[in-house]
Amino acid sequence: MNNIRKTHPLMKIVNSSFIDLPTPSNISSWWNFGSLLGICLIAQILTGLFLAMHYTSDTMTAFSSVTHICRDVNYGWLIRYLHANGASMFFICLFLHVGRGLYYGSYMFLETWNIGVLLLFAVMATAFMGYVLPWGQMSFWGATVITNLLSAIPYIGTNLVEWIWGGFSVDKATLTRFFAFHFILPFIVAALAGVHLLFLHETGSNNPSGLNSDTDKIPFHPYYTIKDILGALIMITTLSSLVLFSPDMLGDPDNYIPANPLNTPPHIKPEWYFLFAYAILRSIPNKLGGVLALVLSIAILTIIPLLHTAKQRSMMFRPMSQCLFWILVADLFTLTWIGGQPVEHPFVIIGQLASVIYFMLILLIMPITSMIENQLLKW
């Protein structure tokens, strides 16, 4: 009798994706983050679903409904904090996943990489709209400031902003549509993640050496299933510790004040995972220029395959490129720190320098260094 795992139409797909999938024998723990992102997405959809059962997307009751969830719903506080901090875990895994792709040259799988960038944009949009829903001070003013950036678009800007707002300011219509989009986008993200995997399985996984691994493959199960379970346990332990011991560590205290259009908070800032992009936005004095830099700070990932001048795919055997990669990581930490600081000296100039270094490293310094390394190979 034929094995149902290999003959059943649905089981066949699962089998070829998670069981019999030929996988390079030398992939390290940096390859765990794809599965961790899948777990994060499922956790966010489930906790979000239970929150949506009790949440009301009305300006008069949104803040109260979140309070009601935390105080009156059975384990509502747990669901709410798992969802809020789960978003932070999601972005930690995302940044590490993208960093892994940059370091080991995974961007050479063009379709997989570009869908990944699209996924990053979609997750960022989802997270931004989710932050607006509790309708605290930072929710309201964050929504006002970020949506207002679209008014920098020539000619159609003002009309576009009012169309998104559904009025002349961030109000009930805005909150309702943000809730609708925040609910639907994770399912679109899940579908895109499926396409992301589809394209990845066309080529097979990359590996730390960057070399073709067709001669040395092992089945995904049990070797990498057990490895992914270990990664998942570490992530779940970290998330649980965060949720149960300091659930508000990554949030903003201002969001415990109900939204008030008549009172602006002293420092408007987004969640920590957007601070690097926010710092780049603020470092340019011109509004349109800032918006372009903000979009380009993420969109630049799409042109990285074009900037790959090295003869080797991975940075594993390229020490100069490795140094530059870690300088880029340090620069992103600097930008994240600056994004959370007030707009005053010396933070402004540090932010501007860090922004210039960010774009210079990716567009100029790293490609030139790769070319120098190519010459060094001949020695």
Curated annotation (Swiss-Prot):
Assigned protein family: Belongs to the cytochrome b family.
Name by which UniProt lists this protein: Cytochrome b
Binding-site positions, heme b b566: H97, H196
UniProt-listed Pfam families: Cytochrom_B_C (PF00032), Cytochrome_B (PF00033)
Originating species: Crocidura horsfieldii
Subcellular compartments: Mitochondrion inner membrane
Membrane-related topology note: Multi-pass membrane protein
Keyword Transmembrane on entry: yes
A single GO molecular function term of this UniProt record: metal ion binding
Extra remark beyond the main annotation: Heme 1 (or BL or b562) is low-potential and absorbs at about 562 nm, and heme 2 (or BH or b566) is high-potential and absorbs at about 566 nm.
Cofactor(s) required, per the database record: heme b
Residues binding heme b b562: H83, H182
SUPFAM superfamilies: a domain/subunit of cytochrome bc1 complex (Ubiquinol-cytochrome c reductase), Transmembrane di-heme cytochromes
Coarse class of the protein's main subcellular location: mitochondrion
Binding of a ubiquinone, residues: H201
Record gene name: MT-CYB
Subunit structure: The cytochrome bc1 complex contains 11 subunits: 3 respiratory subunits (MT-CYB, CYC1 and UQCRFS1), 2 core proteins (UQCRC1 and UQCRC2) and 6 low-molecular weight proteins (UQCRH/QCR6, UQCRB/QCR7, UQCRQ/QCR8, UQCR10/QCR9, UQCR11/QCR10 and a cleavage product of UQCRFS1). This cytochrome bc1 complex then forms a dimer.
Cofactor annotation remark: Binds 2 heme b groups non-covalently.
